[in-house]
Structures are given as structure tokens and as C-alpha cells.
Amino acid sequence: VYGAYVNDDYGFAARILVSRALREPVCTINYAKSAGVEGCGSSFVNRLEKNDVNKLQQQFFTMKIDESCCKPFSAIVPLTGTVGRVIGPIDSTQSEIDMTLARLGIPSEFSEEAQAQAQALPDAVESDKEIEKRVDLRDVGLVTIDGEDARDFDDAVWCAPLNDGEGGWRLLVAIADVSHYVTPESPLDADAQQRCTSVYFPTRVVPMLPEKLSNGLCSLNPGVDRCSLVCDMIVSEKGEVTAYQFYPALIRSKARLTYTSVWNALNGDVQDFLVRGGNLTDINNLYALFKALLQARGRRGAADFTSAE
């Protein structure tokens, strides 16, 4: 319990601190505060012994909060704790990444239980078993389109014009069936909930799931069978979805395409696109559908925002 005096009439206001979301704040030495410790992104302040100060200057490090200390990071009175792990020099790019992960409470390692669950999974999709309960779309020309440096491919697309005399397209969007491998309340699920998403840095990726899943079973790599969930849609010439259904499927991506290779192919430079296994007919169909969807979006009055990434 902690509190502060409101005024003489109302006395003392008490609050209860149930738990801490972040138990080890990232800190640096702040000489302006008489060799005190200052938290990165919080008002955490503490004093260190002289030996610790000499060892930790110009370093990022964590502080383990004293469990008996019941004040929040925003309290006026300094928290108490001990030095945890040394992250690295404050002028290092790698240290900046590790500091950010620690400051936001994003784990960089998976629990032993999650790693064991991942290792127990098969190295490849057991197609003979999966095809009994999934729609077989392995002959459909689904492709992934991602950035140049992407390593995990979680969605694939394909479309073809309808021959019913009314125009429009059949569009398939397939996403990796993560729930087939990551069951609710399992160790993998618990670790994924801590991360919520994969975190991308300039020199490093912290995946939401172990590599066997993120770059393997749940990545729609070209030429291999993958379990997926599919949205199968009918889109009119006006870009309106007139029918759809969802179902589990077994797919086999035909190509790992990039935004650059696709755009170049649409503008006549097809070399890299073809090397990657792209199909010009399919990509032109997708582009025609895109333009219809874009026009429909404009008719709905959608707003565009320009921002720098």
C-alpha cells in the first residue's frame, strides 16, 4: 500500500499496488543526480555503491525491484532494488535493441516448456493426414508477396476472372493456420501472448513463435505443403464482395514474390519476377482486382494518410 496526503481536511489517501507489469526497469547512471540511477522511460531513482557506479557508467542495466517495496515507478519516493543484468554500452546498436526489449518487457527467449512443445512438432506437414480434413488447394497458383527482407510468409493470394458473363473474380486469401499447432493455454500460447506479435529491428527479429513455427510450419514457403485457413470470395466488377466462405485447406505456394518484383513486372520488367516463379497471368488478374477494390474504397469515402516510416 502506498499513498500521499491530499490535504489537511481529507487526510491520507491509500492505494493498493497489486502487481507490477515490469519488474526489472532498464536504467543508466545519472551523474546529475549524484551518481543515482535513472530509469529509461520512468521516474525510477535509486542510489548505488561507488563500486557499482564505476562498473556501470555508460552502460544500460536492469534493476531488480525490492519485493517489499510497494511504490509504483511514478512515486515521489525512490524505489529500492539491486542491480540485475548488464545489457551493454549505451552507444551500441545491439544494446539499444536489448534495452528496448527489456524496457517494454518483451522476452527475447522462449520458455523451456514452449521450446519443448515446438520441438515435439513434426518437421514437415503430414500431408496424408491433413488432407482428410482440409480442402486440397495445392494445385492452385497461390503466391506470397512480401518485402525484400521478409523471412516469415503468413499469407498468400490468388484470383481468377469469373466466366459467368457478369464479370468479377474469385479471390482466395490463405493465411497460415497457426491455431493448428498453438493450442489455447499451451506453453506456446502463453509465450505468444507475452509478445503479441513479432518485433522487427534493423538488425534483428524477435519472433512471436519459435523459429520452427515462425519460419517453418507456419510460414507459407514456396514449394512445400502448408496448413492454412482460407477465405474464398466472389468479388464483383465494382469491387464488392458478393459471397464468401471460410475453410481449412492444404496449400502449396507457387512463388515467394516481393513488392518490387511484382511492381516491376506490371511495368514490363519481368526478369526477377519470372526467376522467382511468378505467373504473369495471375499477377495481372490480381492487379485488375486491386484496381476494382481501390475504386470501391474511393466510393466509400475512405481517407488516405501520408506518413513517414
What are the roles of these predicted feature ranges?
Residues 1-309:
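Conserved, carboxylate-rich catalytic/transport cores that coordinate ions
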